[in-house]
Structure formats: C-alpha cells, structure tokens
C-alpha cells in the first residue's frame, strides 16, 4: 500500500543519537509497509558528524563539539542551530530504484528552494552539495547532502545553511574540501525565517519528487 509522504517539523533542537534512532525505526517500518515515507525538518545542537569517507585529519578541533560517526555517505559536516536539516526517508523501490538519480533529485530540490529566495544554487562536478558563486573566483557551499540507503529505503538527507554560526565550521574541513568556504542565506544578505525556508522546501518537493 502506498501512503502520502508525511511531513514532520521539530520545533526544538533534536539530539543526534535520538534522530538516528528514530530514522532507523522509521526505515524498518517503511520497508515493512506499516508507515508512510517521511520528510523530517529539524535542527540539531552543535555537533560534527563523520560520514563513511571521513578523513581523521579533517577533524581540526575534535574537542570543540561532540563528534558522531554515522553510516551516511560523505565526510565531515557540521550541524547546529540556524541550519535546516531535512531527513528524507523514501522508498526507492517505488521511485525508480536509482540512488544516483535520487541524489540528483536532492540537489534539484535544494536548487529550486534557493531560487525561491533569488539565490542561484549550483552543482559542481565531483563535489556533492550545492554551491554559490561569490564572484572573483570564490564559491562557497550553502547546502550539504549525505545519504544512506537500506533495502532501498533512504535516510539522512540534506542540510541547508539558513543562519548558522559559520565560525562553527572552522573545527572541520567541511566535506574534505579545503579550497572553498561555506555560506548561508543570511550571509548572502537575506533574512528568511526558518518557517520561510520550510515553506519553500515543502512547495518545491513535489515539483521534483512528485505529488502525493
């Protein structure tokens, strides 16, 4: 049986281990057909997470925030207040069973969301995530992507910088990329609320992934 995608928004920061446990439980339920697919919008307390490709040398300041190893793809990233995390739990068996297409769709979702704020988000070959051209040869990352797939059910997802403390990224080499920086919507001179961003994410999701 196919259910419509459920949307969940957490108003308070969610501890990382709690979020992982909740995703694990939901993935099993989606696979069993007892729960609908889920998009979970939340923020975390300040932390660093290490993906399966993380290089320990990229953890510059290991004592700054808690560090969690996780099974998602990618390297080190930062999560914290002011960053909208969207955990996306979808059943790819009924969505084409193509992980590469799924990641491209996450990128497209972010690009369309940023366009709602008149920001041109761009892909970069060989670099997962969404980037903003700052001019003069400078480009900064505004959104990260890290996914895991179990029995064709996705979890983890995306992290869009709305108004985080960008200095918190200094404790790592984000995604192992030393030559580029990070930015946020507020750093670009925009002032959307988290509710504004959530509305944009919810409006553009069906454009990319289809209506329920």
Curated annotation (Swiss-Prot):
GO terms for molecular function: lipoyl(octanoyl) transferase activity. Its EC number is 2.3.1.181. It catalyses: octanoyl-[ACP] + L-lysyl-[protein] = N(6)-octanoyl-L-lysyl-[protein] + holo-[ACP] + H(+). Disulfide bonds: none annotated. Keywords: Acyltransferase, Cytoplasm, Transferase. InterPro entries: aa-tRNA-synth_II/BPL/LPL, BPL_LPL_catalytic, Octanoyltransferase, Octanoyltransferase_CS. It is found in: Cytoplasm. One of its GO terms (biological process) is protein modification process. The keyword Electron transport does not apply. Gene3D superfamilies: Bira Bifunctional Protein, Domain 2. Residues 33-212 form the BPL/LPL catalytic domain. Pfam families: LplA-B_cat (PF21948). Substrate binds at residues 72-79, 144-146, 157-159. Pathway: Protein modification; protein lipoylation via endogenous pathway; protein N(6)-(lipoyl)lysine from octanoyl-[acyl-carrier-protein]: step 1/2. The record marks 141 as: Lowers pKa of active site Cys. Coiled coil: none annotated. GO terms for cellular component: cytoplasm. HAMAP family: LipB. Catalyzes the transfer of endogenously produced octanoic acid from octanoyl-acyl-carrier-protein onto the lipoyl domains of lipoate-dependent enzymes. Lipoyl-ACP can also act as a substrate although octanoyl-ACP is likely to be the physiological substrate. In the reaction, the free carboxyl group of octanoic acid is attached via an amide linkage to the epsilon-amino group of a specific lysine residue of lipoyl domains of lipoate-dependent enzymes. Belongs to the LipB family. This is Octanoyltransferase.
């Amino acid at each position: 049986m196919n259910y419509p995608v459920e949307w969940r928004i957490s108003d308070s920061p969610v501890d990382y281990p709690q979020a992982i446990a909740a995703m694990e439980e939901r993935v099993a339920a989606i696979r069993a057909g007892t729960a609908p697919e889920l998009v979970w919008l939340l923020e975390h307390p300040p932390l660093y997470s290490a993906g399966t490709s993380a290089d320990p040398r990229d953890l510059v300041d290991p004592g700054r925030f808690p560090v969690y190893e996780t099974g998602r793809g990618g390297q080190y990233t930062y999560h914290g207040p002011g960053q909208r995390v969207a955990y996306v739990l979808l059943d790819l068996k009924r969505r084409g069973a193509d992980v590469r297409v799924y990641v491209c769709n996450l990128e497209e979702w972010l690009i369309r969301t940023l366009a709602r704020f008149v920001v041109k988000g761009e892909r970069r070959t060989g670099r997962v995530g969404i980037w903003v051209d700052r001019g003069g040869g400078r480009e900064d990352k505004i959104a990260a992507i890290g996914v895991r797939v179990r029995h064709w059910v996705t979890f983890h997802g995306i992290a869009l910088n709305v108004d985080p403390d960008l200095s918190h990224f200094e404790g790592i080499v984000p995604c192992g990329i030393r030559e580029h920086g990070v930015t946020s919507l507020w750093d670009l001179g925009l002032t959307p609320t988290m509710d504004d961003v959530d509305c944009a994410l919810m409006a553009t999701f069906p454009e990319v992934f289809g209506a329920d």
